[in-house]
């Protein structure tokens, strides 16, 4: 009977060792998978934060763009209205000018032969074109500066 007991004991010990090895193997796998899960969860959280930040920045940039686009459109409309008013005679464009002197010998005394100083039509158009471009450039510059100050930090 000693021999049978020894064989059974050896088999039980082998089974216990094999089961211990299997349990240890699966425990190591569980620890590895848990570490991978935790790492992926951290990366997912970070990615979600980045996405939220990007979406917030996109909304801010869209609002900033809408604001300056509206200001630019308003400035252009004001410039066009001013141009139309000057062309229709409802408003006057005042620019410092000097009239050329007329020889006194060729004119009668006390008679005003010269018209008031006025810009040529092309110069008037050029003035409004330059004014419009200046306003456009100024609004674009203000928008770009605000974008840089708010978004590029």
From Swiss-Prot:
Q: What does this protein do?
A: Component of the spanin complex that disrupts the host outer membrane and participates in cell lysis during virus exit. The spanin complex conducts the final step in host lysis by disrupting the outer membrane after holin and endolysin have permeabilized the inner membrane and degraded the host peptidoglycans. Host outer membrane disruption is due to local fusion between the inner and outer membrane performed by the spanin complex.
Q: Which organism is it from?
A: Enterobacteria phage P21
Q: What is known of its domains?
A: The coiled coil region is probably involved in host membrane fusion leading to lysis.
Q: Periplasmic side of the membrane: what ranges? A: 25-153
GO cellular component terms given for this protein: host cell plasma membrane; membrane
Alphabetically sorted, this entry's keywords are: Coiled coil, Cytolysis, Disulfide bond, Host cell inner membrane, Host cell lysis by virus, Host cell membrane, Host membrane, Membrane, Signal-anchor, Transmembrane, Transmembrane helix, Viral release from host cell
Q: Which family does it belong to?
A: Belongs to the Lambdavirus i-spanin family.
Q: Which terms under GO biological process does the entry name?
A: viral release via disruption of host outer membrane
* Main localization of the protein described in the UniProt heading: host cell
- Name the chain's protein: Spanin, inner membrane subunit
Q: Where in the cell is it found?
A: Host cell inner membrane
């Amino acid at each position: 009977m000693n021999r049978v007991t020894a064989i059974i004991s050896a088999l039980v010990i082998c089974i216990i060792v094999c089961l211990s090895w299997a349990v240890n193997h699966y425990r190591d796998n569980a620890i590895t998978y848990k570490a991978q899960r935790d790492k992926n969860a951290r990366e997912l959280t970070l990615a979600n934060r980045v996405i939220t930040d990007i979406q917030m920045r996109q909304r801010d940039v869209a609002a900033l763009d809408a604001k300056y686009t509206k200001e630019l459109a308003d400035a252009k409309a004001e410039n066009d209205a001013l141009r139309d008013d000057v062309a229709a005679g409802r408003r006057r464009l005042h620019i410092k000018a000097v009239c050329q002197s007329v020889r006194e010998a060729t004119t009668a005394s006390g008679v005003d032969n010269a018209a008031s100083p006025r810009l040529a039509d092309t110069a008037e158009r050029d003035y409004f074109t330059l004014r419009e471009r200046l306003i456009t450039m100024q609004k674009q510059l203000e928008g770009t500066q605000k974008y840089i100050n708010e978004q590029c930090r």
